[in-house]
């Protein structure tokens, strides 16, 4: 084990020298850890020693598929710092006897260090299989081995514990294969806004819910904490999720309940334990029921933490804290419910800065996977600014652009209080000089509150890596409506935010193909679904809700091929693209996973999608149920993906067999010709 630790130690400094700025230290905690069964995956990690200060500490958790593939279920994964309390405990176990005359029962003591868990962050795995029920009804396929998604957590307040040698635990609460975990920490040197002088756990786990009295007494009882000397402020962090599904209450996974944070016996803070944006998470589409709203979590996303300022209640030498959940009743015999809870309290010393504004992150342009909904970008710039100090932040100039290129300056005004943030949408940058591949984008704050500068200039600037949106050659839009067309709308906006093309008056089960001609520039295409369930979802197919299936959307290159394909997209499908001769590559052409025939049932026109196999020509046969050939089409090229439209309005209303053949491949599907539309 000593050799492993030395290797990790050396890896840290190589990364720092070659990849990151001089004031940033990278430490790898887990590398390709295979989470394949319900257990704790521990790794001893060497962090910086005492004496260093860090203004920001981030933890990056990269989730991927295990070597055997991704699991098909939504499991929670906790990242915990296992703090050695200095105490020692032991267990007593009976050993098998080796003496029968007389009988001797021996015992053994297992001595171990007492470790206290501090939860740094939590995520819920996506449904990694069952990705295409039309093609794989038994869920035999999932994300491929290259799939990864990175989650970022701000763990700055855990600085006193991220010292010397510490065990970092990836706690996988799954019961099947599996996911991989890569965890790294990023330490950015400097003074934090307020130094942490003590960290105390309020709750470290949840439990089953039988009734309100049982849960509050056994799982989340009120606790009294002593306030450390020299404390000037304090804050509580809460992570809470609901699980299980009682048939009477739908709790805890599918019921929206409030939870209350009490201070000294009085409710002071309230939050709704509910996520309604699961149809917009960055990891989609998924198998499973990923679109449903849930109790403060979504499959394929990190669990959002809640923070509450306790400073106004720091009177005396102790404080009583308590968490309560809105009461509900479970039906007897209807299944169990539970809530996973962790809560930590941070006690701080005096502030280091009286006035400190920061750029917290750049959402667009960026290659960071949490912002994939807005990237790759060529349009408006999206940044997040934060006020770290108690003095209100009311204005600032923002300078931004391609690093090394022409910069643009805009003015932000608002009124941000202590630790409040604002997402700022800015006009497009000057993209002159952008190149193919990865570029760097810079944004910085100037003259916040009309001052020359704030007291902490180290966080006034943020740099992101990005790739400019791809170029589209002349294209056409293909939209096949499902049975709920009133839920959908299509818009294309230019870089000024002006709508230059739109369509929303769709008819049910009708396919639209329209050429789109635009002047040179940057554009955003947005397809929305008011019910946040896309155009086609396997759940509706299995439950017989066919009016919400069989929709499809494609961006087709007029010369052949497909730029974009989607049908299961939840709330929206958003993409940026460039028209013209900017120095960016053309968008890669995609291929469908298989042949597709739609709409089905058909009322007169049948569209047949043939993937690009580049194997000569394809042929299509339409036969009746007795095998009699009704129609045939030959010599369909397969160098690129093609959609072939067939008029079947002259056929009688009946069931037909459509067979598509390409070389040694063939695809057969039943199609219903119907006269009812």
Where do the PLM segments sit?
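Short glycine/proline/serine/threonine-rich loop/turn segments at secondary-structure transition edges
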Residues: 157-164, 314, 431-440, 532-539, ...
């Amino acid at each position: 084990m000593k050799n492993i630790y030395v290797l990790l130690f050396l890896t840290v400094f190589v990364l720092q020298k070659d990849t990151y700025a001089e004031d940033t230290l990278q430490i790898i905690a887990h590398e390709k850890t295979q989470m394949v069964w319900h257990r704790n995956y521990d790794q001893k990690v060497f962090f910086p020693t005492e004496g260093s200060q860090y203004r920001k500490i981030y933890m990056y958790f990269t989730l991927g598929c295990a070597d055997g593939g991704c699991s098909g279920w939504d499991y929670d994964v906790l990242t915990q710092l296992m703090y050695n309390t200095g105490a020692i405990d032991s267990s007593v176990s009976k050993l098998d006897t080796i003496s029968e005359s007389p009988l001797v029962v021996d015992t053994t003591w297992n001595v171990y260090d007492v470790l206290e868990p501090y939860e740094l962050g939590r995520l819920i795995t996506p449904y990694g299989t069952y990705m295409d029920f039309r093609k794989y009804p038994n869920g035999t396929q999932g994300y491929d081995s290259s799939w990864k998604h990175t989650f970022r957590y701000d763990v700055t307040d855990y600085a006193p514990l991220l010292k010397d040698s510490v065990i970092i635990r990836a706690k996988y609460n799954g019961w099947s294969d599996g996911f991989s975990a890569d965890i790294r920490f990023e330490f950015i040197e400097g003074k934090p806004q307020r130094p942490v002088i003590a960290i105390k756990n309020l709750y470290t786990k949840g439990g089953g819910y039988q009734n309100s009295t049982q849960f509050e007494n056994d799982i989340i009882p009120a606790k009294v904490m002593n306030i450390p000397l020299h404390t000037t402020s304090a804050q509580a962090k809460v992570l809470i999720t609901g699980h299980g599904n009682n048939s009477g209450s739908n709790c805890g996974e599918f019921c929206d309940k409030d939870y209350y944070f009490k201070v000294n016996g009085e409710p002071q803070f309230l939050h709704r334990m509910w996520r309604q944006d699961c149809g917009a998470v960055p990891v989609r589409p998924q198998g499973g029921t990923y679109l449903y709203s849930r109790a403060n979590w979504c499959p394929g996303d990190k669990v959002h933490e809640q923070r509450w300022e306790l400073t106004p209640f720091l009177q005396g030498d102790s404080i009583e804290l308590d968490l309560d959940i809105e009461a509900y009743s479970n039906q007897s015999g209807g299944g169990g419910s539970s809530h996973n809870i962790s809560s930590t309290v941070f006690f701080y010393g005096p502030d280091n800065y009286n006035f400190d504004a920061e750029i917290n992150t750049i959402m667009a342009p960026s290659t960071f996977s949490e912002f994939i909904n807005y990237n790759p970008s060529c349009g408006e710039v999206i940044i997040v600014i934060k006020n770290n100090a108690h003095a209100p932040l009311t204005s600032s100039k923002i300078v931004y652009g391609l690093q090394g290129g022409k910069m643009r300056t805009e003015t932000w005004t608002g009124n941000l209080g202590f630790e409040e943030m604002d997402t700022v949408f800015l006009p497009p940058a000057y993209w002159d000089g952008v190149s193919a591949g990865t570029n760097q984008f810079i944004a910085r704050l100037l003259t916040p509150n009309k001052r020359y500068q704030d007291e902490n200039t180290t966080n006034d600037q943020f740099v992101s890596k990005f790739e400019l949106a791809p170029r589209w050659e002349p294209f056409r839009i293909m939209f096949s409506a499902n049975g709920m067309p009133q839920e959908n709308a299509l818009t294309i906006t230019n870089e000024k935010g002006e709508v230059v093309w739109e369509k929303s008056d769709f008819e049910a089960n009708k396919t639209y193909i329209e050429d789109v001609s635009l002047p040179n520039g940057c554009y955003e295409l947005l397809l929305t679904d008011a019910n946040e369930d896309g155009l086609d979802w396997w759940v509706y197919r299995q439950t017989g809700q066919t009016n919400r299936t069989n929709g499809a959307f494609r961006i087709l290159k007029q010369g052949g091929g497909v730029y974009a394909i989607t049908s299961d997209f939840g709330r929206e499908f958003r993409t940026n693209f460039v028209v013209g001769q900017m120095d960016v590559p053309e968008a890669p052409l995609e291929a469908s996973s298989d042949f597709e025939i739609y709409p089905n049932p058909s009322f007169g026109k049948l569209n047949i999608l043939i993937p690009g196999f580049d194997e000569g020509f394809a042929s299509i046969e339409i036969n009746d149920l007795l095998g009699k050939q009704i129609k045939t089409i030959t010599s369909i090229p397969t160098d690129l993906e093609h959609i072939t439209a067939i008029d079947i309005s002259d056929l009688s209303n009946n069931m037909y067999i459509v067979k598509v053949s390409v070389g040694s491949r063939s695809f057969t599907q039943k199609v219903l010709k119907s006269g009812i539309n």
